[in-house]
């Protein structure tokens, strides 16, 4: 009898496995589908024009076959302007919006015409959301390019978190735990307000396809 219960438990686990560890078999790309990419480019690799990250990003942008490309934190110096514009020139329609600091830029590159744009701003510096209407064939599709508050953990916080996980018995672990929980909780509250603000606006658009 024990083996029978074990068998049922194994079958039940196997049925649920795909939900937690999905294994996707490659399938042909459906005809007429839209490929979308979105990245936080973090100022295109930092301040130096010769960094490996910057050159790699330029190459990636040049070779991207996405129909719609969304980027966050798209700041750049005047010295980079021509190179970056050349890298994204294969997208016919392009738009960048800045609110507050120049580092908070959002960029949309599209194969489809941009009909209009709505910008939602938030109290926290550098966080904005741009909602676009694109003409895709005979349809109108809404594309959301958003930059919400993150979990607010800096490099020191991440280091403290790793040490807390590896050595939970250390005296400072409890204090670090309480401090990080408080910090992430505050960031989460700000992010929730931003998400609610976006959703309130999207509800006014009615029944239209939305890419987020």
Provide a role label for each language-model segment:
Residues 93-108, 175-204:
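Active site of divalent-metal-dependent phosphoester/diester hydrolases
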Residues 35-41, 53, 57-81, 142-147, ...:
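Active-site beta-strand/loop signature of hydrolases that rely on acidic residues for catalysis
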Residues 5, 11-30, 49, 62, ...:
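Structured beta-strand-rich core segments of catalytic domains in phosphoester-bond hydrolases
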Residues 38-54, 152-187:
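Acidic/histidine-rich helix-loop elements
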């Amino acid at each position: 009898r024990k083996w029978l219960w074990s068998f049922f438990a194994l079958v039940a686990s196997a049925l649920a496995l795909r939900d937690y560890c999905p294994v996707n078999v490659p399938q042909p790309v459906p005809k007429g589908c839209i490929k979308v990419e979105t990245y936080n480019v973090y100022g295109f690799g930092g301040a130096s024009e010769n960094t490996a990250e910057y050159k790699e990003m330029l190459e990636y942008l040049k070779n991207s076959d996405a129909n719609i490309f969304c980027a966050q934190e798209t700041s750049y110096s005047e010295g980079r302007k021509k190179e970056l514009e050349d890298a994204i020139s294969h997208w016919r329609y392009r738009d960048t919006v800045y609110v507050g600091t120049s580092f908070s830029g959002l960029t949309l590159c599209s194969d489809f015409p941009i009909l209009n744009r709505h910008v939602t701003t938030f109290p926290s510096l550098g966080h904005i959301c741009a909602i676009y209407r694109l003409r895709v064939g005979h349809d109108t599709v809404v594309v959301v390019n958003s930059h919400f508050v993150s979990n607010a953990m800096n490099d020191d916080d991440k280091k403290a978190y790793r040490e807390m996980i590896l050595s939970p018995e250390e005296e400072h672990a409890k204090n670090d735990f309480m401090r990080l929980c408080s910090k992430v909780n505050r960031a989460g509250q700000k992010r929730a307000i931003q998400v609610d603000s976006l959703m309130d606006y999207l509800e006014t658009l009615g029944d239209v396809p939305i890419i987020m």
